[in-house]
Structure formats: C-alpha cells, structure tokens
Design a protein with these regions (language model features):
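Metal-dependent phosphoester-hydrolase catalytic domains
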Residues: 1-33, 193-202, 208-284
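Short hydrophobic/aromatic-enriched beta-strand-loop microsegments
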Residues: 48, 94-101, 225-230
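Acidic/histidine-rich helix-loop elements
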Residues: 45-59, 157-181
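Solvent-exposed, acidic/flexible segments
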Residues: 55-59, 80, 105, 130, ...
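Structured beta-strand-rich core segments of catalytic domains in phosphoester-bond hydrolases
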Residues: 16, 21-33, 55, 64-67, ...
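Active-site beta-strand/loop signature of hydrolases that rely on acidic residues for catalysis
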Residues: 41-48, 62-85, 137, 148-151, ...
C-alpha cells in the first residue's frame, strides 16, 4: 500500500513538472479554437527554400498552396524573385502589391499583398556585411491599419544529418546554436524598436530559427505580443522537418489589440518548412 502511494506521488510530481515546463516554454498548445473562423485579416508565412530557384513543377505546386489558402498577406522566406518567375507570375494575379528584400545574391524575402501597402521598406539595423534584415509594410484593414514586420533570423547552419555527425564526433552543435542566437537576438532588438514605434497593431512573422522562450522570442514578446500557435493552436505544431528533427521555429506573433480567429500549420513536402497561416479580427 505504501509503495503504491509513493508511486502515485512520483507520477503526480512528474506530471506537474511536465505541465509547468510546457507552460513556461510553450511547447504543446491546447486550445478550444478550431476550424476556419471568418477573419478580417488572414496572413501566411512560409520559408519556401527557393533561394536558388526551383523547377517549374515545384514552383507551380508552391503557388497553388498559397493561392488555395487565399490569405490577404503572404511572406515568403528564402525566395529569389529572379529565379522564381513562375511563382511570381501566378501570385501576381491575386497579389499585385509586393515588397522584396534580397539579403545577398541568392536569398531574399518578399511580401505579397492583396491590399496596397504604405510605409513599406526595411527596419534599420546598424550592421554591415551581414544578411540581417526585417522588412515592413502597413496595410489598411477595416477601420484601422496593421503594421506587418517580416523576419528571417540567422540559421544555425546544420541539418539533421550534420547535427548527428557533430554529436557523434563530440563537437558541440550547442555552441553553433548559441552563436547564431546572438545574431537573432540582435535582429530581435532592433525589430522590437520598430514594434514600439508603431502607431498601429503589429504582426511579426517569419522563419525565426528559434523556439518560444528563447532570448530572441522573449525580446519580441516583451512588447506585449502573443504567439498565435500557443494562443490558438493544438498540439506541437512543428514547422520544420529535416530527417528526424521536427521543430517549431516559424512563428506569427501579434499585438493584443488584434483578436486571433484561427491558426494552422499546413503539412507539405515542398520545402523543409511548413507554412503557418493565421486569421485575425481587427475591428475594435
């Protein structure tokens, strides 16, 4: 009888610890929101891994997914406009307004919008020789405007196979992760300044290459932003898949003035990342 009591206490303790860490680090979301509720603003972010282009069939499939989602505003990471002409020509029919940033010769980020954008451009980040950039645009929604900031934060530069090799050879991928995290934190710091200066509700989205409760995410969320998946998703919601690694590193963060109506991660094998889609109500 005593041993059963001890086992029960241990199991309850483990459960409470697991619940605490899940709450603290926002790992597995549990929410009642579900389905596709009507929204005034629907946004989508996706790292399409097209920095060096893609074959025509893959480009058409990528465009088809985006068009079928019918978001009002789309951000694509690792996108080269010069070599993704098929995607661009198909999207331009529905999304006539664009804002592009090409961080270096083969890689960039782009906004596609149904609505005209104002105050578009780049957030000033005082660093040279680095492909660190946050793009921005303001769009009119209902009786208000929303400031959208698109980020693609520094990668850790390893995939599942490389990580396994480093682990086996006793070199530490953690050091590589922390080095890249410093760059992400730097970008988050200057993006935070843009958030605080905004006169409108803000959405920050993109491939952030980091997890909830990491320093870069904490910096952004210290402005009062909420994570759409944690607030409205269900389950782990992995957005990155490579070999055995399943990570949630693509995020849509939003101001408390916006009301989250829906959020989902769409499974696809067209990229190493899955697109994240969220719908919001803007009217007060």
């Amino acid at each position: 009888m005593k041993s059963r009591y001890i086992i029960t206490i241990i199991c309850l303790s483990v459960l409470l610890v697991a619940i605490y860490f899940n709450w603290k680090y926002e790992v597995v979301a549990i929410n009642l929101i579900g389905g596709e509720e009507d929204s005034e603003l629907k946004v989508m972010t996706w790292n399409v891994h097209c920095s060096e282009g893609a074959d025509i069939i893959r480009q058409r499939k990528i465009a088809e997914i985006i068009l079928n989602e019918d978001a009002d505003f789309v951000q694509l990471n690792e996108y080269n406009l010069d070599s993704c002409t098929v995607i661009d020509s198909l999207l331009k029919i529905k999304y006539p307004f664009t804002e592009e940033y090409q961080s270096h010769q083969i890689c960039g980020d782009i906004f596609y919008s149904k609505r005209q954008m104002t105050n578009s451009g780049h957030v000033w980040i005082p660093i040279q020789g680095k492909s660190i950039q946050t793009i921005k645009a303001t769009i009119r929604v209902a009786s208000d405007s929303v400031q959208i900031l698109g980020v693609h934060m520094a990668s850790n530069h390893y995939d599942g196979i490389a990580f396994e090799k480093e682990f086996q050879s006793d070199t530490t991928s953690y050091e590589k992760y922390k080095y890249a995290q410093e760059s992400r934190s730097f970008q988050a710091h200057w993006t935070k300044k843009a958030i605080l200066e905004s006169k409108h509700p803000v959405i920050v989205m993109g491939d952030m290459n980091d997890f909830n409760s990491s320093p870069p995410l904490d910096t952004l969320m210290s402005c009062g932003l909420k994570d759409s998946w944690w607030e409205g998703g269900n389950g782990y919601g992995s957005t990155y898949h490579d070999c055995w690694m399943l990570l949630r590193i693509d995020h849509i963060l939003y101001s408390k003035e916006l009301k989250l109506k829906s959020v989902k991660v769409k499974d696809t094998d067209l990229s190493g990342h899955n697109p994240v889609v969220a719908g919001f109500s803007v009217s007060k």
